[in-house]
A protein has these predicted regions:
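Structural motif
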Residues: 70-71, 85
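Soluble "head" domains of membrane/secretory-pathway proteins
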Residues: 100, 112-115, 136
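Short, positionally conserved secondary-structure boundary motifs
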Residues: 1-63, 83, 94-95, 109, ...
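Hydrophobic beta-strand signal
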Residues: 74-75, 88
Length: 144
């Protein structure tokens, strides 16, 4: 079940880049001048920098959600989880990344659902040690 390793988020998030205002996915645009700017992940992508952490995904339990072995999950601990959120949960002393399913809450349990039919949901009952540690807001993935 241990399919995410938390990474220290204390690093410089500013990258000096030459970027264009838009990247067209259809026909190429005429040559445009490059803008000299910087991309700061905390400023441009993260709403709660002080509550955001990164985790390296290991395993294949979330492949049908597009989350693969080696991806880096960006986790916001300040975001409120809801039914269907992809969360990082701490279950019985281990971290895992799964869909949160609260539809059985009135029956005394919730489930953490994988996105791969090879795996079964994890049923969380009142006797389990459980905490939603944060909500996955996006992933960073290698393409090569």
């Amino acid at each position: 079940m241990n399919d995410i390793d938390i990474i220290n988020s204390q690093f410089n998030t500013t990258l000096p880049l030459e970027i264009t205002p838009e990247l067209r996915a259809g026909f190429p645009s005429p040559a445009e001048e490059y803008l000299h700017d910087s991309l700061d992940f905390n400023r441009d992508l993260i709403n709660h920098p002080e509550a955001t952490f990164y985790g390296r995904v290991t395993g294949d339990s979330m492949t049908d959600a597009g989350i693969n072995d080696g991806d880096i999950a960006v986790i916001d601990k300040a975001r409120e989880p809801h039914n269907g959120s992809i969360v990082v949960a701490f279950v019985n002393k281990e971290f895992t990344i799964k869909y949160l399913d609260t539809t059985h809450k009135d029956q005394g349990y919730i489930e953490l659902r994988p996105a791969n039919p090879k795996y079964k949901p994890i049923r969380i009952g009142p006797d389990d040690e459980f905490e939603v540690w944060g909500v996955v807001i996006f992933t960073i993935k290698p393409w090569n």
